[in-house]
């Protein structure tokens, strides 16, 4: 990759800096490769005994199932208990990766869901069913019977289920007669003190090579009483596991995401959801007790009480309007939480993803309106599990949710029906016309020189991910009639880099890469993201207690007694701050700068690392960062006032002798001549 041209000033010697060779790329998009199991791949009818039910045999009958669920209101749910079972492949991971997965990632991910979800306690031992050679089975006395024989091995994803976890093999002949227990099989010891068993492997499968797949998961067996998934699997992709500290939280979030697919957030499980009384939300076939099969998708088809298609008329796109059909999750708690989040009382529910094909569409939230919700189809920045996701799990009828475990979701919060029910083109156009912020969307094309900004929560330095694509986008994803500095007629090539967000451009974290290896990220809280001192042109400070602050429109400059250099990207940076005396104070280098009013430009002139750093930082409103701090003390931000005189602020100077200044002048002229000569040679 060639060096980008550096900005020049008259009489300035410019140095090509190593940072310019780095690629600034929007944050890693960890794509979910959830491959929902087909109907015939899932084993149903695992018999368990629920707490307070009469006996194991009753659990298989529909009457007992309804009776068990209807007693939920008078039976205390217990925290979900997940048992992890490792395949041998996990132990073959590199030591550093194994320790990370075994000691941190899986324990934290499992503990989160054990605290976030409660379930009717499973009493006694779980023995999983054996798989059958045929997709046809018979159910006799509540037990599933294979035709003639069971499979020699029962798999759950990439993992073979241990024999000690399996029940006996039950078989009938082809006509459903002569049903019996295969005398060659014995019941295993079973699984105790667990409500869900999770088989984990670490194999570099073909699915691992698709996108940036870190892990994938699904359920493999469901119990007889409530249809709740009771066993599942996850595969971790060894080559995609990063041990970098700044990527740990995203890795943990990815594993949490995959676990939730196995627990219930899956297109292959929606048809089995139940209401609070234990009644199926989707009608069942009388002869099988299962929902009707969608032959095309090879999954059980849900009813309109779970997911409903809605047509958005007059959906604004470049050059006009179209009708857009969306799939909405319309279960009661999801509807209530979605309406509360967006502040839109007429919102039908929560929109599901309509792109990405099998494994992404319908099995995730729509990226356009729930961008960093962890259950969207790709992780792009700061993923959170919101109340909306917990509401879905509770609406399955299998769990109670502990909403204190939800993380606040700022994306779209309180933005109303015009954000939640209309296109991003409408939102951008409407707010531009009213002189309002178009955030969380943006309209600044990503190009050199790169000008960064801050995310709305000020947790990260970010870029607008609006780029020129190599092809014209589909009409329904063309979101601009015109763009600054873009030739008329070419607007259809421009859109956000995240396709799942309908190519709506938005402010996004990014990473610095060198030879496709991540050097550092742009999230303020990670000390590992600090630039090296020789490359820290804006004197940033990443780590605990840091937030993002905007720079002024002018580029930052570094001067020594011999050189002056400007950096090819600027716009925002991460800095420590404090709140005292009713004011926000920003720490830069070894100095503290007081913000007297919103929009105040703090002029920075600090000598560090052999350079004089010159730039400016813009003060945000005090309440954005200090409001809650002062409120906890019974105080508040003081009203804005005139800033202190400039001589009250730190102002360093270079100490250069006359000889240094003379040498500097000569160096400038020589460098300018060499640069000019080089340019001419390059064009000859």
From Swiss-Prot:
Q: Name one GO cellular component term.
A: membrane
Query: Where on this chain does Zn(2+) bind?
Result: 257, 261, 364
Enumerate the InterPro entries for this protein. Answer: Peptidase_M8
Which catalytic residues are annotated? 258
Keywords tagged on the record: Cell cycle, Cell division, Cytoplasm, Hydrolase, Metal-binding, Metalloprotease, Mitosis, Protease, Zinc
Give the protein's cofactors. Zn(2+)
Copy out the cofactor comment: Binds 1 zinc ion per subunit.
- The parts of the chain that form a coiled coil are none
Q: Which GO molecular function terms does the record list?
A: metal ion binding; metalloendopeptidase activity; peptidase activity
Q: Where in the cell is it found?
A: Cytoplasm
Q: Which domain of life is it from?
A: Eukaryota
One short Pfam family name for this protein? Peptidase_M8
Q: Which GO terms describe its biological process?
A: brain development; cell adhesion; cell division; centrosome duplication; chromatin remodeling; germ cell migration; gonad development; imaginal disc development
As recorded in UniProt, its EC number(s) are: 3.4.24.-
In which family does this protein belong, per the annotation? Belongs to the peptidase M8 family.
Q: What does this protein do?
A: Essential for the coordination of mitotic progression, and also plays a role in cell migration.
Instruction: Kindly provide the name given to this protein in its UniProt entry.
Output: Leishmanolysin-like peptidase
